[in-house]
């Protein structure tokens, strides 16, 4: 995931690669930053395209990491801000995206990158509602190493798929 002024090109490449390589299952994943106010529409487009072209969608859902930079750049360049200015709207869109992914699990694999307890509980409830096994390989919980360990460890202990992600590189870059 990158800033909005870079992400569209990444999205185009990721979609082309999903269409080419995700014929039987998701191998290629892209990140959706749900603090962007256009991501639900993007997700809906991606789901429609995957159905039409018969490929699997691989997604990591996150809230977003470049909020201040996005707002500043939009002001500097004079365009509409591409991110939600209220965190509640980001939370709403994150949970909506999570719901859309689980409702379309027949052709979606999702990694729920969240430190938010409510979204984690929602994912568990959605899996139960749709009779999806806790250890279904299409669904993962993910948290940054050293953060929200209570979510990671409790979900793993309960039998859910959990990964910790580790930023790599100089501290100033990660």
What are these regions (language model features)?
Residues 1-174:
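Positively charged, amphipathic and often flexible ligand-engagement surfaces
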């Amino acid at each position: 995931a990158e800033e909005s002024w870079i992400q569209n090109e990444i999205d185009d490449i990721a979609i082309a690669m999903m269409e080419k390589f995700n014929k039987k299952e998701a191998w290629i994943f892209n990140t959706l930053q749900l603090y962007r106010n256009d991501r639900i529409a993007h997700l809906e487009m991606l789901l429609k395209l995957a159905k039409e072209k018969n490929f699997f969608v691989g997604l990591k859902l996150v809230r977003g990491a470049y909020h201040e930079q996005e707002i500043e750049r939009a002001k500097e360049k004079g365009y509409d801000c591409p991110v939600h200015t209220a965190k509640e709207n980001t939370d709403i869109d994150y949970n909506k995206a999570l719901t859309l992914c689980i409702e379309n699990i027949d052709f979606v694999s999702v990694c729920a990158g969240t430190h938010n307890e409510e979204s984690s509980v929602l994912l568990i409830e959605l899996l139960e509602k749709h009779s999806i096994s806790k250890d279904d390989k299409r669904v993962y919980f993910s948290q940054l190493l050293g953060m929200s360990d209570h979510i990671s460890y409790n979900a793993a202990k309960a039998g859910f798929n959990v990964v910790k992600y580790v930023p790599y590189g100089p501290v100033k870059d990660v």
